[in-house]
Regions:
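Catalytic strand-loop segment that frames the active site of acyl-thioester-processing enzymes
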Residues: 1-43
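Generic structural detector for well-ordered beta-strands
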Residues: 23-25, 73, 131-133
Length: 137
């Protein structure tokens, strides 16, 4: 993990070994928020990209690096105090030896909605399409 104690993996589930639903909990006390931003903490976009890559590494049990990002949309701000729990859906497909096609969509529970799995409303904070390559380390 590049950022020690930045997040905790809560669960990782897959019905088919291609699409995964990952749940993580952010640490709102992490030192990164002292500079980004002290009174109104926001998860830096680059940290979201790193978190997604680390989840893919855990799934594939290998070190990976981004080699192409064809589309990355940050759709809403993630405040680690108000919405510490994130859900990320990852789709990982082998496209050639050592390369994976990654599609990711991250969501948070909308503030003020009922916190049950069936009725809670979600807000998308990132949509990503990229290629990850094994570093063979």
């Amino acid at each position: 993990m590049l950022l020690d104690n930045f997040y905790t993996l809560l669960s990782s589930e897959s019905p088919d070994s291609i699409t995964w639903t990952i749940r993580v909990e952010l640490n709102p006390e992490h030192a990164i928020y002292q500079g980004h931003f002290p009174e109104h903490p926001v998860v830096p976009g680059v940290c979201l990209l790193q978190l997604i890559k680390e989840c893919a590494e855990d799934i594939r049990r290998q070190q990976l690096q981004y080699t192409q990002v064809s589309s990355c949309k940050f759709l809403s701000v993630v405040n680690p105090v108000k919405t510490p729990c994130l859900s990320v859906t990852l789709t990982l497909k082998d496209i050639e030896e050592g390369k994976l096609q990654l599609q990711a969509e991250g969501t948070v529970k909308v503030e003020g909605t009922v916190e049950t799995e069936e009725t809670a409303e979600n807000e998308c904070f990132i949509k990503l399409k990229a290629v990850l390559t094994s570093t063979k380390a």
